[in-house]
């Protein structure tokens, strides 16, 4: 089993000598029975002091990933204006879940905040998923985050029935 590797890419703030890395999920992502806990540093954006070779901070989007939600895009370095016209240098990460992480480059704090949302437990014997995952309010997700029966394909009756049966048998 592995931890979060540099999966999505790397960006560097040359002036501050900070490296930003988006990480993958802990292997094997579909089975977390033998890797208990949050699997720190996986599914994260981390900041590393290049000169001193030290971790400055990490921000984990998904804890104990069993859904293949690694951060597959490289971090984007930019600046935004927030409260009272204050300019903040940020690192932005777009994720497979449709979230856009906007983090302070120096602290790793999420600029817009989040809430912790209770999530369903796994039905896999021995699997201990995190009880809560982060739910980001802003920026609004750029992709749909919930799938229900109304979303099943209607391209053909055969396809619709096939997917409906698959979902029914998983419940």
Residue ranges of each PLM-predicted region?
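Beta-sheet-rich non-transmembrane sensory/scaffold domains
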Residues: 1-171
């Amino acid at each position: 089993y592995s931890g979060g590797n540099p999966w999505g890419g790397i960006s560097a703030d040359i002036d501050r000598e900070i490296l930003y890395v988006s990480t993958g999920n802990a292997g094997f992502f579909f089975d977390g029975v033998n890797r208990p806990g949050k699997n720190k540093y996986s599914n994260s954006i981390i900041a590393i002091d290049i000169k001193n070779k030290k971790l400055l901070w990490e921000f984990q989007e998904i804890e104990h990933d069993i859904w293949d939600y690694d951060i597959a895009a490289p971090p984007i370095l930019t600046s935004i204006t927030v409260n009272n016209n204050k300019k903040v240098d940020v690192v932005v990460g777009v994720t497979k879940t449709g979230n856009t992480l906007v983090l302070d480059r120096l602290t790793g704090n999420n600029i817009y905040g989040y809430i912790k949302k209770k999530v369903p437990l796994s039905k896999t014997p021995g699997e201990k998923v995190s009880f809560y995952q982060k739910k980001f309010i802003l920026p609004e997700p750029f992709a749909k985050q919930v799938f229900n029966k109304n979303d099943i394909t209607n391209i053909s009756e055969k396809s619709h029935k096939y997917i409906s049966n698959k979902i029914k048998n998983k419940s």
